[in-house]
Design a protein with these regions (language model features):
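Short, Lys/Arg-enriched N-terminal segments with co-localized hydrophobic residues
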Residues: 2-15
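Surface-exposed acidic/polar loop and edge beta-strand patches at domain peripheries
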Residues: 15-132
């Protein structure tokens, strides 16, 4: 997020491009936002799950290199369980048995990794279409 803030200020807004990133399983259009700066750096973020899709930085010879793992369309993020570049929430990591106790009350969560809840399950932040 610090990187995002550094690249995206009101003054630099003209350096933001928006383009289609595919259609979600439920028929909604996902968008890709690409921000760039004067140093040749670019980041791309999709509104689907607020995934960081790519970070292009110039190498020692000035050639741009992508330094993060990501997919070319929203389909990859919907079907692959790796959570590349994901905004994770409400909980991160695994909750064993997909249940936890708080103040004497047991809460059952959705199971999405064997018998566990991983990164908030199938309704985590990384599976939602965000408003930008």
């Amino acid at each position: 997020m610090v990187l995002f803030y550094t690249l995206h200020t009101t003054k630099r807004r003209r350096n933001m491009k928006k383009q289609g990133f595919g259609t979600t399983k439920d028929g909604k259009e996902a968008l890709l936002y690409t921000l760039s700066n004067k140093n040749g750096m670019e980041i791309s973020v999709t509104d689907y799950g607020a995934h960081l899709v790519s970070v292009l930085v110039p190498d020692k010879d000035g050639k741009k290199r992508d330094v993060v793992l990501g997919f070319d369309s929203v389909t990859g993020y919907e079907t692959d369980g790796s959570h590349f570049g994901a905004t994770i929430g409400r909980n991160g990591n695994r909750i064993a048995g997909a249940a936890f106790e708080l103040h004497g009350k047991t809460y059952q969560l959705a199971k999405n990794e064997n018998n566990n809840n991983l990164h908030s399950g199938p309704d985590g932040y990384d599976y939602r279409l965000w408003k930008v």
